[in-house]
Each structure stands twice: as C-alpha cells, then as structure tokens.
C-alpha cells in the first residue's frame, strides 16, 4: 500500500544545543534497537518520523530530550498535521515558536 507523509521543514534554531547533541547521538546509533529508524541525520539537521511510534513525545521524554523540544514536536504535529518533521540549519524559523542562538 502507498503511504503519504505530510512534512514541515523548519530551522534547527528551534531546538537547543543540548537537544541537537541528543538528536545527533540518537541518529548515529548502530545497534539494532536504536532510534535510527525514526530519527535520521541529514547532514544539516534531522528528520523525525513521528508516526513511527504510537506516543512519540513520550518516547522523546524517555530518551532525555527537553520539554521545549517535546513541546515543539507537539505544536508542529497538531498545528500543521504533519507526520514528518525536517529540522534543517538552512530552513526558515517559524513565527511564534521559540528560537535558540547556539
């Protein structure tokens, strides 16, 4: 069956430096039960497949990502109805969302 993914692209300025380090680490795991099936490093950011888990925000909490990052994921998935979040260093900042200078 064909699956359609809805996506939003936004700046990595919306995440903290600490969350960036966590995402980098999680996206580079090599073990079979790692997070690389739903957190992907792109070279200039990350792709998050939020439909890979029933409760992705709870999973992010268990993995140690900040409340600010989890709130961003909730906001993007609810406001824009997306299942794929592309955080990219070259993307635009979205209005009304916090940004971090790192």
Where do the model's predicted regions map?
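Short, extreme N-terminal segment that most often corresponds to the first beta-strand
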Residues: 1-24, 86-89, 99-102
């Amino acid at each position: 069956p064909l699956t359609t993914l809805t996506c939003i692209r936004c700046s990595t300025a919306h995440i903290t430096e600490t969350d960036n380090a966590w995402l980098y680490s999680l996206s580079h795991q090599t073990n079979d039960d790692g997070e690389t099936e739903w957190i992907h490093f792109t070279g200039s950011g990350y792709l998050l497949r939020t439909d890979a888990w029933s409760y992705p925000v709870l999973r992010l909490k268990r993995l140690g990502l900040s409340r600010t990052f989890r709130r961003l994921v909730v906001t993007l998935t609810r406001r824009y109805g997306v299942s794929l979040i592309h955080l990219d260093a070259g993307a635009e900042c979205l209005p009304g969302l916090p940004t971090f200078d790192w």
